[in-house]
Curated annotation (Swiss-Prot):
Complexes and interactors: Homodimer.
Purpose: Global transcriptional regulator that regulates virulence factors production by activating or repressing the expression of a large set of genes in diffusible signal factor (DSF) pathway. It includes, among others, genes involved in extracellular polysaccharide (EPS) synthesis, flagellum synthesis, protein and fatty acid metabolism, multidrug resistance, iron uptake or genes encoding extracellular enzymes, membrane components and a few transcription factors. Regulation can be direct or indirect, via regulation of other transcriptional regulators. Not involved in DSF-mediated biofilm dispersal.
Record key words, sorted: Activator, Allosteric enzyme, c-di-GMP, Cytoplasm, DNA-binding, Repressor, Transcription, Transcription regulation, Virulence
Keyword Cell cycle among record annotations: no
UniProt protein name: CRP-like protein Clp
Organism: Xanthomonas campestris pv. campestris (strain ATCC 33913 / DSM 3586 / NCPPB 528 / LMG 568 / P 25)
Gene that encodes the chain: clp
Free-text disruption phenotype from the record: Mutant produces less EPS and shows decrease in cellulase and protease activities.
């Protein structure tokens, strides 16, 4: 379909990421002991300096983990969706306060349980499920370490254009990405893209214009169609 001023796009949402290595029964038993809470879009669930004593599990929606500098600049460290744990480091490394921001990207439902309570349950009613839950958390930690290593390498060795191209391709694999007749449709603002790659909003906008002129994508507002990624 045309990408002009009157574009109408028929889209289908990609399948959500399945809960890593956890079966439905294990999830249900874990959730039975957790407090479920709903959060609006763009809500900070916790910020640096907040007490660190809770494990979160994303039931629905999408969240971002963000590092914040003293001058209020932000760098997005990762996006996490349904079936993923957040704040899991506290199960293994004792820390009194949070060091990053957990912010909702969409309306979310999160399950929350204190580390102390979960450790007690691992010795009692959740004892049979403890190996599976801990293994799932280990898988997620390993994946996030690989993602962080890749992001650090990009910051060190790639220019802004290459970082943005690779980040857009990463976003095309996220559950929120939608199929499009010419590739993949993403919803990401210049500000969000800048936070993902570590540059200014203005620089992100200039790079998108260049990539559009080169025929690699079409960008309008917060909508980006990345060509050739179906």
């Amino acid at each position: 379909m045309s990408l002009g001023n009157t574009t109408v796009v028929t889209t289908t949402v990609r399948n959500a990421t399945p809960s890593l290595t956890l079966d439905a029964g294990t999830i249900e038993r874990f959730l039975a002991h957790s407090h479920r809470r709903r959060y609006p879009t763009r809500t900070d669930v916790f910020r640096p300096g907040d007490p660190a004593g809770t494990l979160y599990y994303v039931i629905s929606g999408s969240v971002s983990i963000i590092a914040e500098e003293d001058d209020d600049r932000e760098l997005v460290l990762g996006y996490f969706g349904s079936g993923e744990f957040v704040g899991e480091m506290g199960l293994f490394i004792e820390s009194d306060t949070r060091e990053v921001i957990l912010r909702t990207r969409t309306q979310c439902e999160l399950a929350e349980i204190s580390y102390e309570r979960l450790q007690q349950l691992f010795q009692t009613s959740l004892s049979p499920d403890a190996p599976r839950i801990l293994y799932a958390i280990g898988v997620q930690l390993s994946k996030r370490l690989l993602d962080t290593t890749r992001k650090a390498s990009r910051l060190a060795f790639l220019d802004v254009t290459d970082r943005i191209v690779r980040t857009l391709h990463d976003l095309s694999k996220e559950p929120e990405a939608m199929s499009h007749p010419q590739g993949t449709q993403l919803r990401v603002s210049r500000q969000e893209l800048a936070r993902l790659v570590g540059c200014s909003r203005e620089m992100a906008g200039r790079v998108l214009k260049k990539l559009q002129a080169d025929g690699l994508l079409h960008a309008r507002g917060k909508t980006v169609v990345l060509y050739g990624t179906r």
